[in-house]
Amino acid sequence: QTCALPIFKGWDWCSGYHYSDSIIIGFSHTHLSGTGCSDLGDILLMPYTGEVRTARGEQDNIEGAASSYYKHANEAVAPGYYSLLMDNGVKAELTATERVALHRYTYPSGSEHRLLINLKEGIGDKAYDTYLKKIDEYTIEGYRFSKGWSPRHKVFFTLKCDQPIESLAVFNDDEAAGNDELTGESVKGVITFKGDAPTALVKVAISSVSCENALANLRTELSHWDFDEVRNEAIDKWNDQLSCISIDTKDERAKKIFYTAMYHAFIAPTLYCDANGDFRGHDDKVYTNNTWKNYSTFSLWDTYRTLHPLFTIIKPQYVSDLVNSMLSIYDQQEKLPIWPLIGGETDQMPGYSAVPIIADAYLKGFTGFDADRAYRYMVASSVYEKQNG
């Protein structure tokens, strides 16, 4: 979920983007939606022109920073697409496949075209290990390891450009540290594009496992550079998702509210596996699975009453994958999930809300998971002595 990111200022900014803002520090690739805790905001990119700059700036002063002011009048938003003409003159457009974001930047003429890769910034978390390396004239790889609401969060990425990279200057926070490669706590890099082509396309593929898996995700899901094709495919996928319920009303406002709420309902749980089935577990081990898709971001104490029963009606193909994901988490941490987030257990909120979700799926006849195993895990989690509630 690629989106504009402002300066994080507390609880209201848990998802990153906030409509009250007028400053953008870049476009990040992982986000929460509707939560009361903050995290993610990984792999921040910021296009700009002119001299090399890496600083974020502050809310009351971004002079000399890479950040930019913006106006909502210059924004366009739709499921699967985001567009913003920033005050710095760069127009950014974003779309995505399941595991690969595609950026299209249109630069103003007359000065160097830059792209900041900022691995320090997130959404209320703390990066502790980051890495960037220029692989060739078009490719950069890296990772961002962080701790926040999730106690363990690792994002590897491969970035490919359609325009040649003239240079990659690397920085430890804002201190220059040479070119092409750096590992540290707060690594940043500035791409300078070769030539003066007005438009640059940038692919960013992510993985919880490795840079190699991120590259494999990119090759599997996005082998071409046709931005509009990817955008249209994303729109078609959202239309397919939202068309599972149709309403008949003359009240256009009510219809917008209904489908906006339905859109929000489909944002989480989130897909958490590579195209080959690999994913990183809560125990930091890599698991390989080819029979079901692994998911994370389960706000179970919020969702066991209504969202998961709704999925059994309108997304039955989804249900067994979710249950198998919960059973896999038990194998990783010896209890069913409480509030799992992208490779870590937050243990947020009391209770063991996975149990009624699994029971509901079983009683409704879903057979895509091992029922005996599920029952054992449900009983064990119900008497887990260290669990709150």
Labelled PLM ranges:
Residues 1-389:
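Accessory carbohydrate-recognition regions in carbohydrate-active enzymes
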